[in-house]
Structures are given as structure tokens and as C-alpha cells.
Amino acid sequence: MLPAKRYAEGLLKLAQEEGKLEKFYEDLFKIYDLFKTNKQFVDVLFDLEMKVSNKKEKIKQFLDESIDRYIVNLICLLIDKRRETLLPYIPFYYKEMYDKIIGNVEVEVIVSEEVDEGVLRKISNWLLKRYDVKNPRFKVKVDRSIIGGIKLLFNNIEVDATIKGALDSIKKELIQNAI
């Protein structure tokens, strides 16, 4: 198991005990945003010559007052153990486990033309009944090549109810039977 994943698991267990699943999620991604937007934060975090105590104090100055103390403690622990490089990966491992706990599932919806909220609600209800997907997050893509129908991709599952998919299936069957 990857070290970043172990830290994320420990943090998730703590979040569950403290009733702060969503708060930790938000805070971890606030810190991740610092990586993307604040070069000084990254420079301080990865400065190998700076004393650990100085580094922790400087890093705390970058953090918003709203960041939970447990998240701040995690960052300090990573600095103490010289594992700062794990910090950008922890939010994504946490998100993966968080999504499983609360039932979030990324669902790619491929259609031949735009769909409205009513269609997405029907898909959501079907996913709940058929696959126990409680909180689908839809990412709709329009692909005119499917001709009509719908294709869903989620959790390594593909549900193909497109005209193109049906035609491809018939074509494959005809080729197999012709041999």
C-alpha cells in the first residue's frame, strides 16, 4: 500500500470518529489548491535545507484559519518525518475513500444530443435501483456517432444502450456466424 494512501486512511478514520468527513475533504483540497496556485508554499514545503521547526511555522502561515487542526497536524507530521512529497497525493486517496463511504460515483453519460435534468433524474433513479449508486455525479458528453440512445460508464461498468452499440453487436454476430 502506498504511504500516501495509508495517511489518507488514517485521516479518514479520524474524520469518521470526529464527524468531519466533509470538512477534512474540503480542507485537503484547499491545501491542494495551494500547491497549484502558490509557488512560495511549495518552495517552503520542499526546502531541504530549512530546519523542520522553521518549516512548520512558515507553512502554518500559508494556511487559512479555517483549516482543521487535524489537517495542520498531518502536515506537521509529514514535515517531521520528511515525507512532504506525499502531501499532494493524500487528498486524492482521501477523495476515493470518501466517495465510497457517501456513495458518490462519477458517471460518464454519453448521448447523441444534450439531455435535460429530467433525463438525468431518471438515470439517477435507475442507477440507484440497479447498481445501488446513491449520489451519481454526471459528466455528460455529446457524441453524435452513437446515433441515438445512451451509454453510461462508471465504476469500471459500461452500460451501452446506443443504436451504434446494437449495430456493432449485430455486425459482430453476423461475422462470427459467417465463418
Swiss-Prot record:
Annotated membrane topology = Peripheral membrane protein
GO terms for cellular component: plasma membrane; proton-transporting ATP synthase complex
Q: InterPro entries per the record?
A: ATP_synth_OSCP/delta_N_sf (IPR026015), ATPase_OSCP/dsu (IPR000711)
Q: Which residues form the signal peptide?
A: none
Where in or outside the cell is it found?
A: Cell membrane
Q: Which UniProt keywords apply?
A: ATP synthesis, Cell membrane, CF(1), Hydrogen ion transport, Ion transport, Membrane, Transport
SUPFAM superfamilies listed in its UniProt record: N-terminal domain of the delta subunit of the F1F0-ATP synthase (SSF47928)
One GO MF term on file is: proton-transporting ATP synthase activity, rotational mechanism
What Pfam families does the entry give? OSCP (PF00213)
Subunit structure, per the record?
A: F-type ATPases have 2 components, F(1) - the catalytic core - and F(0) - the membrane proton channel. F(1) has five subunits: alpha(3), beta(3), gamma(1), delta(1), epsilon(1). F(0) has three main subunits: a(1), b(2) and c(10-14). The alpha and beta chains form an alternating ring which encloses part of the gamma chain. F(1) is attached to F(0) by a central stalk formed by the gamma and epsilon chains, while a peripheral stalk is formed by the delta and b chains.
Q: What does this protein do?
A: F(1)F(0) ATP synthase produces ATP from ADP in the presence of a proton or sodium gradient. F-type ATPases consist of two structural domains, F(1) containing the extramembraneous catalytic core and F(0) containing the membrane proton channel, linked together by a central stalk and a peripheral stalk. During catalysis, ATP synthesis in the catalytic domain of F(1) is coupled via a rotary mechanism of the central stalk subunits to proton translocation.
Q: Which family does it belong to?
A: Belongs to the ATPase delta chain family.
List, alphabetically, the PANTHER family matched: ATP SYNTHASE DELTA CHAIN (PTHR11910)
What is the designated name of this protein?
ATP synthase subunit delta
Its source organism is Caldicellulosiruptor saccharolyticus (strain ATCC 43494 / DSM 8903 / Tp8T 6331)
